[in-house]
């Protein structure tokens, strides 16, 4: 009986020693897995016949809030949550509210990304492929093709991982009472 127990113990030890260890996550995968908020300045380039360049600030918070504040060349604010998108254009005195049909908010995109052989991360949501590249352990650029087949590249700078962001900034509150609100 003792010999049987010794053999059993050796077999258990060998099986444990040779068991596959769980895959270790890369630094970038760890960031994506634990990301609860994100803040960065951005440069957005829309490549078509005549490239358009926009600058602004992004604030995003899990589970699905995002605020894109475009500062140049035109001012615009885009508020996103899991239900709707509000596009406020102060120069036009107008806010357009559209239901969010597809889960294409910032965090849904980030949570669905899969690491590629080249080190980038990709996901496809409703026929749109998103590609994220990290630099210095932080999201650096996000690329995708828009509905008109234009390549959009968003480059992040001054990125902060998990900063404290107040929930209130994600709620659209008109700064001017005389704006038109269009519901689509």
Curated annotation (Swiss-Prot):
Sorted keywords for this record are: Chaperone, Periplasm, Protein transport, Signal, Transport
User: Which InterPro entries does the protein's record reference?
Assistant: LolA/LolB/LppX, OM_lipoprot_carrier_LolA-like, OM_lipoprot_carrier_LolA_Pbac
Could you state one GO cellular component term attached to this entry?
Answer: periplasmic space
A Pfam match is LolA
Q: Does the keyword Cell inner membrane apply?
A: no
Q: Name one GO biological process term.
A: lipoprotein transport
* N-terminal signal peptide: 1-19
Where it sits in the cell: the answer is:
Periplasm
Subunit field text: Monomer.
Family as reported in the entry's similarity comment: Belongs to the LolA family.
Reported function: Participates in the translocation of lipoproteins from the inner membrane to the outer membrane. Only forms a complex with a lipoprotein if the residue after the N-terminal Cys is not an aspartate (The Asp acts as a targeting signal to indicate that the lipoprotein should stay in the inner membrane).
Q: What's the protein called, per UniProt?
A: Outer-membrane lipoprotein carrier protein
């Amino acid at each position: 009986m003792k010999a049987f127990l010794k053999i059993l113990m050796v077999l258990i030890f060998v099986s444990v020693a040779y068991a596959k260890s769980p895959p270790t996550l890369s630094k970038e995968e760890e960031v994506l897995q634990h990301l609860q908020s994100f803040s960065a300045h951005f440069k957005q380039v829309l490549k078509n016949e005549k490239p358009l360049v926009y600058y602004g600030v992004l604030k995003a918070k899990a589970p699905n809030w995002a605020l894109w504040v475009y500062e140049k060349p035109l001012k615009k604010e885009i508020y996103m949550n899991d239900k709707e998108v509000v596009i406020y254009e102060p120069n036009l005195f107008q806010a357009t509210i559209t239901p969010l049909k597809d889960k294409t908010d910032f965090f849904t995109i980030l949570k669905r990304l899969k690491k590629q052989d080249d080190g980038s991360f990709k996901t496809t949501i409703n026929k749109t492929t998103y590609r994220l590249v990290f630099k210095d352990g932080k999201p650096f650029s996000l690329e995708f093709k828009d509905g008109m087949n234009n390549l959009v590249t968003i480059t992040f700078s001054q990125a902060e991982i998990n900063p404290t962001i107040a929930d209130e900034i994600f709620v659209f509150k008109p700064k001017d009472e005389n704006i038109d609100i269009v519901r689509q």
